[in-house]
Every structure is written in structure tokens, then in C-alpha cells.
């Protein structure tokens, strides 16, 4: 799915019939032709283009709530590229503090804040602990991976990893 909400299909079909792993070396392989299909719903507007370029950090942090994955990812890239890790951690903590507890997407927003810190390698143990205790198992699973990655920089890494290892959901 593209940033506009359309589905894109890349069709680079090759007529080579080959049962080897090196078909990409075949001299008859077509390297120059292909099609990209763009599927949209008729009479439906496309997703609005988010403001990434020229946006200040508060607007970018708010983009972490976007329903579009591409928008959330681009906002994180921009924040990490233009700010120091400790600044990114402060932004993530501020974002989390402003979240509504009864928001149905609360755990996904927590996950996005932790992902922002992870992209910047801004170790934030309080946020990590909070995501490890989230209701959504996908957020807890992500937090477990981050706890493993940051284990050498966390004071309570064994405790956090033990919490994840004893989780009730098998994907965590």
C-alpha cells in the first residue's frame, strides 16, 4: 500500500523457465521492461498527503498517530535525522504523556514512541517498561525485542527480559 492509500503491484514477469538458483544470470533475462499497476477505489478520494517536509517537531510527533504506516515511518525518519537521541527521547516521552488512556489505539501509540526511541538508539527504560506491560501483545513483543537489543544499556535488563519471557502470549 502506497502513501496515498492505493495498492501498487509491480509486475516484472520474466519468461525464463529455470529450476536453478542463478536464473538472474540468464542472458535472456529482460532487465528493462515491466509494469507497475496502481489500484484505487473509484469515486473515493486518496489519502491526504501528510506534511513531512517543513513540519516542525511537534507536527512530526503528532504524525505518529497517523493511520498510515508510511506517514508514521517518514515522521520517525525525519525526527531521528534532525535531532539528537536525547531530544528524540524527550519528544517520545512528551508524546506518551499526552496520550489518552482510553484511546483504543493507545498501545499502538506507545509502540510508535518506543520505535522512535529505538530508531534513534535513545535508550528510554521507563517507556520500555511501560510498553512491556501494554495490553496489546504486539506492542509487548516489540518491546521484548528492543529490551534484548538494549540489554547492555539497561540497568534492569534481566528483569525486563524475564517479564517478556513469562508473558502469557506466545508471540512475546
Which residues are covered by each model-predicted region?
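Residue-level detector of extended alpha-helical repeat arrays and alpha-solenoid scaffolds
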Residues: 71-72, 107-110, 140
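Amphipathic alpha-helical scaffolding segments comprising HEAT/armadillo-like alpha-solenoid repeats
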Residues: 53-61, 84-100, 121-133, 152-165
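Structural signature of alpha-helical solenoid repeat scaffolds
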Residues: 80, 115-118, 148
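Hydrophobic core positions within HEAT/HEAT-like alpha-solenoid repeats
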Residues: 76, 111-114, 129, 144-145, ...
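Beta-propeller domains with acidic blade repeats across secreted/periplasmic ectodomains
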Residues: 1-62, 70, 78-81, 156
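An alpha-helical repeat/solenoid feature that recognizes helix-turn-helix modules
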Residues: 107-119
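Short inter-helical turns and helix N-cap capping residues of alpha-solenoid HEAT/ARM repeat scaffolds
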Residues: 67-68, 105-106, 135-136, 168-169
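Extended, hydrophobic alpha-helical segments in both membrane/secreted and soluble proteins
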Residues: 9, 139-150, 157, 161, ...
Amino acid at each position: 500500500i502506497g502513501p496515498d492509500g492505493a495498492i501498487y503491484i509491480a509486475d516484472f514477469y520474466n519468461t525464463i523457465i529455470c529450476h536453478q538458483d542463478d536464473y538472474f544470470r540468464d542472458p535472456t533475462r529482460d532487465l528493462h521492461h515491466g509494469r507497475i499497476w496502481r489500484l484505487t477505489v473509484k469515486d473515493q478520494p486518496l489519502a491526504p498527503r501528510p506534511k513531512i517536509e517543513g513540519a516542525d517537531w511537534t507536527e512530526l510527533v503528532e504524525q505518529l498517530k497517523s493511520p498510515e504506516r508510511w506517514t508514521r515511518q517518514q515522521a520517525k525518519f525525519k525526527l531521528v535525522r534532525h535531532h539528537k537521541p536525547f531530544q528524540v527521547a524527550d519528544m517520545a516521552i512528551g508524546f506518551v504523556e499526552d496520550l489518552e488512556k482510553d484511546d483504543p489505539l493507545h498501545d499502538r501509540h506507545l509502540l510508535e514512541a518506543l520505535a522512535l526511541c529505538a530508531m534513534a538508539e535513545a535508550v528510554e527504560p521507563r517507556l520500555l517498561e511501560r510498553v512491556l506491560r501494554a495490553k496489546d501483545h504486539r506492542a509487548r513483543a516489540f518491546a521484548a525485542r528492543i529490551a534484548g537489543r538494549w540489554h547492555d544499556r539497561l540497568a534492569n535488563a534481566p528483569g525486563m527480559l524475564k517479564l517478556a519471557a513469562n508473558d502469557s502470549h506466545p508471540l512475546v
